[in-house]
């Protein structure tokens, strides 16, 4: 069950219009390393984590990523809300306007629509958490690139906060990965997966031959 609070995780109050930056920011909304993909990745992977520790972490982080989506939507909207049609055309957003006017739509910075092909679920906790750690590092790198592209403190502040959350998430996933890895090394070769009914992973000891 989800509970919605009518406030952002970090305040967003952008005063200056910047269509160029709006065009860049959308990549962290609907791009390959963006927050929408992260939320869907974790909320799907959580169901086949082997215990409540893993399920809880992926639920918590996946839910937080939905809050990050809301932050980015707010930032993009504020950056372009007062733009004229001529300004949108000059910024290369005329194709977006043709289909969506000033409404939001998840794409990357090149206008490529969001796709679920950006993330995977395997049912293997170690494989999925490895992907999650890589995803957080890539998102951090993109936020750093975006920060380089603006000098507006009203934009930089939320981006710095989002970047820091990627670092925290990476650390939490790393801890979970090491926890499951240690569990298997200690001889627990059948990590129970709960998905309505009990299922068992095949012996995974071969992961740890070294």
Regions found by a protein language model. Give the residues of each.
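Non-heme di-metal
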Residues: 1-210
């Amino acid at each position: 069950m989800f509970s919605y609070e009518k406030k952002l995780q970090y305040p967003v109050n952008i005063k200056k219009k910047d269509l160029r930056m709006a065009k860049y920011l959308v990549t962290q909304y609907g791009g390959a390393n963006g927050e929408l993909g992260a939320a869907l990745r974790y909320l799907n992977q959580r169901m086949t984590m082997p215990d409540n520790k893993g399920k809880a972490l992926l639920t918590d982080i996946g839910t937080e990523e939905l809050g990050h989506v809301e932050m980015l939507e707010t930032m993009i909207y504020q950056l372009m809300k007062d733009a004229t049609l001529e300004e949108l055309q000059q910024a290369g957003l005329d194709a977006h306007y043709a289909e969506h006017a000033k409404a939001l739509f998840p794409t990357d910075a090149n206008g490529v629509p969001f796709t679920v092909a950006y993330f995977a679920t395997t049912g293997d906790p170690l494989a999925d958490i490895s992907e999650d750690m890589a995803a957080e590092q890539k998102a951090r790198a993109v936020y750093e690139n975006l920060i380089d592209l603006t000098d507006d403190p009203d934009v930089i502040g939320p981006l710095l906060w989002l970047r820091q959350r990627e670092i925290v998430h990476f650390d939490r996933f790393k801890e979970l990965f090491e926890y499951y890895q240690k569990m298997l090394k200690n001889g627990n070769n059948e990590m129970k997966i709960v998905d309505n009914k009990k299922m068992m992973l095949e012996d995974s000891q071969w992961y740890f031959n070294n």
